[in-house]
């Protein structure tokens, strides 16, 4: 069986700082899931983010709160973590517009970074 080379993991903007603010159990779960993504697998907690092609989100629930880590894995063989946040909305599952706007901005940054390398 051929050995799969792990993809590099890069955080855009404040994504790493924001992830570090998550509760310990959530950080471990997200870290494990991102390790799976780096290895070419799709975690069970991953789902496609509506309206943004190729952008995925990891959803973790903890103590009645929902934490999300948004990433893209189809840019130059690198896994870019675009945004990590605690969902604040009490109604519905829709991602707030300000978070979507930030994700779009960081996706552009990731694409620009890939062009430079």
Predicted region positions:
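Conserved catalytic cores of phosphodiester-cleaving nucleases, focusing on short active-site segments
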Residues: 80-83
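Basic, Lys/Arg-enriched alpha-helical interface segments
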Residues: 1-66, 75-78, 88-117
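Hydrophobic/aromatic beta-strand elements that line small-molecule binding cavities or substrate pockets
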Residues: 69-71
């Amino acid at each position: 069986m051929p050995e799969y080379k792990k993809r590099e993991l890069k955080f855009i903007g404040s994504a790493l700082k924001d992830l570090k603010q998550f509760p310990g159990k959530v950080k471990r779960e997200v870290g494990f899931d991102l390790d799976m993504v780096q290895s070419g697998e799709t975690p069970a907690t991953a789902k496609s983010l509506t309206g943004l092609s190729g952008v995925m989100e990891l959803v973790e629930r903890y103590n009645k709160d929902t934490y999300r880590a948004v990433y893209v894995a189809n840019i130059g063989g690198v896994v870019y973590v675009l945004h990590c946040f605690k969902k604040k909305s009490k109604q519905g599952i829709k991602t707030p517009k300000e978070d979507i706007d930030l994700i779009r901005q960081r996706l552009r940054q990731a694409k620009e970074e890939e062009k430079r390398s």
